[in-house]
Amino acid sequence: MAELTPQDMAAKLLATGFERSGPSAATLSDPIADTPMVVTLDQLRPYDHDPRVTRNPAYAEIKASIRERGLDAPPAITRRPGEAHYIIRNGGNTRLAILRELWSETKEERFFRIACLFRPWPARGEIVALTGHLAENELRGGLTFIERALGIEKAREFYEQESGQALSQSELARRLTADGYPVPQSHISRMNDAVRYLLPAIPTLLYGGLGRHQVDRLAVLRKACERTWERRALGRTVAVDFATLFQDVLTQFDTQPDDFSPQRVQDELVGQMAELLEADYDTLALEINDSESRQRALTSEPAAPTPAAAPVVPAAP
């Protein structure tokens, strides 16, 4: 029998009978239980639906700590089925960005190879990951109001994909609470107003950290002015509609939060309404203020009841 050449052997190994039937290393299944592992920065990606889009206010302090001490605890990572890269599971995108910076600056291996805790991708993976990041970000530096609002809008999207139906604000609040991120329904309503009516006009102001109370004031002002506009514009021909007017006025005040004055917004908006509606400024302002007061009375959260005083027990004679 003639001796096989290396080329003949390679041809036989590539024949049908010798085709690989097992899974490749790239497609082996992930662990089915929490498992410590070491991964490299090349294998990790930030969570793509992270609600935080602005720089963590504690970024410099966190970076200094990691440079000196490393990570305090292994970050939790996971992986979507069929994907090549791991992602941060709960929070941690800031720490991942810092590790990349430190690796680029120092080339120290401890910033490139990271001890992590792998946690399997759960059945409700997207919503579990998102609510986990929302909760973790609240604990580590907090989120701006608009970041929370956009995160909750994304959560609504995931819940509606999961259930196949639209959710009311109260049902959204119930589901968020059940998944470990409680948000009052009244806050969800304000967040919806911020995303729908305020964000297109004042993104710099909102991402700069405009808080809930200022957002409340703008939302109440918008609604009060809209009601007054609808009543006074009825049967009239007006050059613009209220939605356009509100956006045009508000855009002028897209500045940093420290320079923002809601009263200036109100003065400008009422002034332009008075001109377009051919109405007296002071009369219009009184109508709007009255409407604002009634709206606040209807939407304000009830005060917590004052606990009853303990009965006074007379001292023994």
Q: Could you describe each region identified by the protein language model?
A:
Residues V53-E61, N93-T94, A129, L143, ...:
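Charged, alpha-helix-enriched surfaces in structured cytosolic catalytic cores
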Residues R100-S104, E108-E171:
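Amphipathic, charge-rich alpha-helical segments that serve as recognition/docking helices
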Residues A149, E153, Q169, A178-G235:
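Amphipathic alpha-helical "recognition" segments
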Residues E226-A233, T237-P317:
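Long, charge-rich C-terminal accessory regions
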Residues Y159-T177, Q185, T237, D241:
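Short, charged amphipathic recognition helices of the HTH superfamily
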Residues E171-R174, H187-R190, R264, E268:
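Amphipathic alpha-helical interaction segments
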Residues A2-I114:
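Short, charged/polar connector segments at secondary-structure boundaries
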